[in-house]
Amino acid sequence: MKAVRYCHVRGCKVYVTLNTLVNDREMRDAVAAAKLASDAGADALIVQDLGMSYAIRCALPDIPLHASTQMSLHNLAGVEAAAEMGITRAVLARELSFEQIRFITKNASIETEVFVHGALCFCHSGQCYMSALIGRRSGNRGLCAQPCRLQYSLGGRMDDHPLSLKDNCLVDQIRRLEASGVHRHSHRRLRQGYPRAAQPR
């Protein structure tokens, strides 16, 4: 609660991320965490799991819900389905082209948001099993070990990272995105030692 007040006094909004998949045994605790965030004054919750989104909407009808990029909303129909569930903003899938972003934003009944800087997954965001298979840490449960960032042999070479995509960097496209109607743009702070290579899409 103190942290939320600190942010609000300085004109910042607080979005609490609950963007992971939950099972039935965890649902009660997930909704309790959402209530704790709501009671603390969070401005919105960022969610991935459809069942948890429904449970939170039933328990906390007034807290705004934002669909995480992990929800893989990559078309207008998906965004509208999320809107029918009470989602008020869709963080669009990072894999979309500018034209796809513009079309969805122009026709969506809710706000849209896009990432302008951060990692791009080798798989489609929210659909990767690589970390779970290799390191028993599921990227769909918030525990990605980022095995795609490691070196792999390719034609006998071990000095390359064939699965590690260059980071997404749309900083020079922010005005263009705003002109298309996108409501928000996000970036993710990178950990020390994280590959820094980036290029515009």
Regions inferred by a protein language model and the residue ranges of each:
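Active-site pocket-lining/capping segments in soluble small-molecule metabolic enzymes
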Residues: 1-73, 91-92, 100-201
